[in-house]
Amino acid sequence: MFGSKFQLNEQSISVIQEIGSHMPGGFFIYKAEEPEELLYANQAVFEIFGCADLEEFKELTGYTFRGMLHPEDYQAVHESINQQIAKSKEKMDYAEYRIIRKDGAVRWVDDYGHYVETDAYGGIYTVFISDITEKR
């Protein structure tokens, strides 16, 4: 599954879903190309956003990376991620940004991302997020 290109496909997505369901924090995967559509998000991501399930999360965010971020933060975060990936041999990035939960509450998250090329989807980001509001 791992190598110079990540073999992300329907079979590996089922493995990722199983692993993701047991992770202690938020984990999601999205396409690097616009509209930055999500390919996967675990239950912990839904909970960070105050959503009960995938359907609520899709309704809230449009199931895109842009839809996950506070509108005022998107451009700066997007540019920062692109700059970090361009400079990083490991294709890693870090960002802090605001989100708007389903109940309207604004929260801060930290985001550790990794850019990977895949055969099935082209460039993707795998991302871990956690709510850091109480630490700010």
Language-model features: where?
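PAS and related sensory helical modules
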Residues: 39, 46-67, 74-79
